[in-house]
């Protein structure tokens, strides 16, 4: 909750202008409004509107383009829309019926230049081979700053959905130099339908992911603004066998803008040592001899 004298002059802005949300599910609208009220925000703009419908241009012309500083979103997965009712400006970015692609395009439009977003998407967005999939990923890389991708384990949304997902972290405008990846394998809860809290070391990668993201941000800021040493970035995030690593945008472009973490993560396999075949054969022959002796003893008993 926002309290204290320092924030008092901004109370009206916090209550009426800072927070916005759009949905056409009335239950979600009520939940969102209650969440805002419980956090001390009584006048948040939680509005009944299909964000992808062409009516958004008429109902909220100011908000549908170049308006928001920050967008956090968990859009519906794997839906399909009739193009005739979809915002034509969004279709101008990516020609598709798939809602998971359209929402990312819509968010790009709604952000101000320099605005930032964190968006949860199904894994298919990262590696889909259709023209629309590749077009959207190219847009994120070439005309915006795709800063990071956090790969999530498949059970994080159980019992409601078991689909594998990832978080896209991007800034509108500019161009991408490199993309930071994090292979998050545990979020502090079991990955079954019960989602029970886990205790002990290794049960939650989130604190490490946040720490590594902050470290990466500091290094990239130093590199871009202060002429930092690129070798420092390479030393810290160049090892693709680790959970956190970075990939140059040129390498991604040469891979048809594939953004799946498994495309770039390197797995080190421990080398197995096997006994000499002659030793194994000798052991098998000894076992066979022992078995034959036991069979003869059994035959004598009969």
What are these model-predicted stretches?
Residues 53-54, 60-223, 230-302:
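A conserved structural/catalytic subdomain of Rossmann-like adenosyl-cofactor enzymes
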Residues 1-70, 78-80, 101, 122-123, ...:
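Conserved S-adenosyl-L-methionine
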């Amino acid at each position: 909750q926002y309290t204290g004298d320092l924030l008092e002059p901004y109370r009206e802005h916090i209550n009426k202008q800072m927070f916005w949300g759009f949905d056409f599910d009335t239950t979600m609208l009520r939940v969102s409004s209650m969440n805002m009220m419980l956090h001390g925000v009584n006048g948040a703009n939680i509005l009944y509107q299909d964000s992808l419908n062409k009516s958004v241009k008429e109902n909220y012309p100011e908000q549908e383009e170049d308006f928001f500083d920050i967008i956090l979103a968990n859009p519906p997965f794997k839906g399909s829309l009739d193009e005739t009712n979809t915002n034509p400006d969004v279709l101008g970015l990516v020609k598709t019926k798939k809602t998971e692609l359209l929402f990312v395009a819509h968010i790009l439009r709604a952000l101000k230049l320099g605005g930032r977003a964190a968006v949860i998407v199904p894994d298919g967005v990262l590696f889909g081979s259709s023209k629309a999939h590749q077009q959207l990923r190219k847009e994120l890389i070439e005309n915006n700053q795709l800063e990071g991708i956090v790969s999530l384990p498949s059970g994080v949304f159980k019992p409601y959905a078991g689909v594998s997902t990832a978080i896209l972290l991007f800034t509108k405008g500019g161009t991408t130099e490199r993309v930071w990846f994090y292979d998050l394998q545990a979020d502090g809860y079991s990955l079954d339908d019960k989602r029970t809290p886990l205790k002990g070391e290794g049960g939650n990668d989130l604190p490490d992911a946040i720490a590594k993201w902050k470290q990466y941000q500091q290094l990239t800021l130093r590199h871009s603004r202060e002429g930092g040493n690129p070798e420092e970035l390479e030393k810290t995030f160049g090892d693709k066998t680790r959970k956190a690593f970075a990939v140059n945008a040129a390498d991604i472009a040469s891979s048809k803008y594939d953004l799946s973490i498994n495309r770039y993560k390197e797995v080190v396999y421990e080398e197995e040592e096997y006994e000499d075949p002659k030793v194994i054969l000798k052991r098998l022959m000894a076992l066979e001899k022992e078995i034959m002796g036991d069979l003869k003893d059994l035959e004598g008993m009969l």
